[in-house]
Amino acid sequence: MSFHTFFFNAIDKIYYRRQNCRRETRFEDLDFDIVRDIVYDPSDGATCRLDVCRLRGTGSLPVIFYIHGGGFEAGDKHCRAALARWFAALGYAVVNVNYGPAPRYRFPAQHVQLCAALGWVQGNAAKYGFDLSRVICGGDSAGAYYAAALACIADNGELQSRLGASPCIKFGAMLLNCGVYDMV
């Protein structure tokens, strides 16, 4: 394990309880409908999983497709569970997605996996009450990079054909927190 992977795994372990296990009094009266570990790509079911979080008893909702960070080599969707509940409390259906970390998965595997997750969202919109006309794509750190890349892929036929992916969802907004971008 590289120092980089060790470092990001340590951050997740140190802050997991603080971020996800505290009693959240502001959510006590809310009834969440959370479905965990849904396989979005059966060819790699151990890695390609997502969670759906929303308020129980609500109709069609705008979607936040959220991608965790972790320095490209670490991280997990479960470390963003409290954030997903917070977004759900605001009236969103949250899709909290995992992808394969480097170096085990090499470019462009993560992009292809995340496009497959978007395909799952589109294919399951009726079942989970996703309003596909109102989709926000977001993430933190490496997840913000992947979210920005998905926005480029969704709007570029050449990138879609190079990756063998065809996300049909267009994003109405982006939620990018401390991502890594090459702006030059």
Where are these regions (language model features)?
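N-terminal presequences and immediately downstream first alpha-helices
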Residues: M1-R26, A144-Y145, M174-L175
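N-terminal cap/lid segment of alpha/beta-hydrolase-fold proteins
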Residues: D12-G59
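Short beta-strand element of the alpha/beta-hydrolase
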Residues: S60-G70
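A fold-wide structural signal in alpha/beta-hydrolase
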Residues: V63, A88-V95
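Catalytic metal-binding/acid-base residues of hydrolase active sites
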Residues: G71, G100, V180
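Catalytic nucleophile-loop/oxyanion-hole region of alpha/beta-hydrolase
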Residues: G75-A84, V95-L132
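Primarily recognizes the serine-hydrolase "nucleophile elbow" in alpha/beta-hydrolase
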Residues: G119-V184
